[in-house]
A protein has these predicted regions:
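Stable alpha-helical elements in mature extracytoplasmic
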Residues: 11-18, 68, 72, 92, ...
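Long, well-ordered core segments of solenoidal/helical folds
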Residues: 20-33, 95-110
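The feature captures the catalytic groove of carbohydrate-active enzymes
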Residues: 39-89, 104-144
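Short, charged/polar micro-motifs that form catalytic or ligand-binding hotspots
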Residues: 5-9, 62, 86, 93
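Carboxylate/His-rich catalytic cores and anion/metal-binding grooves
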Residues: 1-41
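Beta-strand segments within the central parallel beta-sheet cores of soluble alpha/beta enzyme folds
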Residues: 17-20, 35, 88-98, 115-121
Length: 144
């Protein structure tokens, strides 16, 4: 997981394979966003692989987490911040915009607060209890 520090320690070439994987996940992620959520943009769930798997995995608690594309786009933007390469930013802007469009389409108004929250949402680490005391993995507006 050297990509966490790659830019910071002056090894951007170690970050590039991860950045390229992110760009390669856009097309399969668009299909997943449309098929599972009827949303624009693209999504990647908790796990992927070199073959472009972007769909939810078998466990709702961790397999339904939709935040991976946003996290990956943070890396794209971090690379830009270290390089200030405008041509690079122009190339990755559609990737970042696509992830943002997905999240915009996932917003719903939470009944209790009126806040806009993502739904469905989950935490890969934690379950919660519903009103009847049952363990649940999906809800509206889950914070990580």
């Amino acid at each position: 997981q050297l990509y966490w520090l790659a830019e910071r320690i002056g090894l951007p070439e170690n970050h590039e394979p991860f950045l390229e994987l992110t760009r390669q996940l856009v097309e399969p992620g668009k299909k997943t966003a449309q098929a599972y959520y009827r949303a624009r943009g693209w999504v990647v769930h908790t796990m992927t692989n070199p073959w472009g798997v972007t769909s939810p995995m078998e466990n709702a608690a961790w397999g339904s987490t939709v935040g991976s594309a946003a996290w990956q786009c943070h890396h794209l933007f971090e690379h830009y911040l270290y390089t200030l390469d405008r041509e690079y930013l122009e190339r990755v802007w559609p990737v970042m915009k696509g992830a943002a469009c997905f999240f915009a389409d996932m917003l719903v108004e939470q009944r209790e607060t009126g806040w806009l929250v993502t739904s469905p949402s989950s935490s890969p680490e934690n379950l919660f209890l519903d009103e009847q005391g049952r363990e649940c993995a999906l809800c509206e507006g889950r914070g990580l």
